[in-house]
Amino acid sequence: MLEVISIYGFSTFQDLGRSGFYSKGISRSGAADYYALFEGAALLDQDPNSTTLEFIGNGGTFNILEDCMVALTGATMPASLDQKPLDWNTSHYLFKGGKLNLGAPQNGRYSYLHLRGGFSAPKIFGSSSAQPSAGIGKYCFPKDILAQLEKNSELLKCLSIKPFDRFDSTTFRLVKSFQTNLFPSETVERFTETEFSIDNQSNRSGIKLTHTGSGF
């Protein structure tokens, strides 16, 4: 069990998402980085659909209220327990009274804190994935208590995992659509040769890209 002291960016509960509700205007939601959920599940020997805490852009600080086991996956953040560094893509035991701190991601945008037994969160349409813009779930805030869904007394070794390589690519694929031919060929060529960077205003709905020079 954890208590939120501070959240530096945006953080929500996520699992593998919900499907079959587009006709009702409800998107699938779910973790932005599915690989991270499976990596966390492997480290903690649990269901990949277990509820995890997703961080966008920055991490947070947490009080450890009960002994527990966690795993850290996704975009690498500087992590520490009582100011002692913690390895990423690794499972760790956290002991009552400690303080966990997660910083800003260094090689991606979405980072994940997994709790053995999963976090306890309401199931809405079969999923605990939050989508605050649709009134489903909420962001995490200071003083929130993040409880464990299932208690498991079986002891596990702390493990590390080599993550699937997905953070070093800097190339985007351009998929032409029925409107592409409406742009002059010179504009399309300039677009494909332009270097973009990720804007801080990005969110779970999409990643905003910025560039220097005139628009398209």
Q: Predicted segment positions?
A:
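Conserved "landmark" site that anchors the functional core of diverse proteins
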Residues: M1-F216
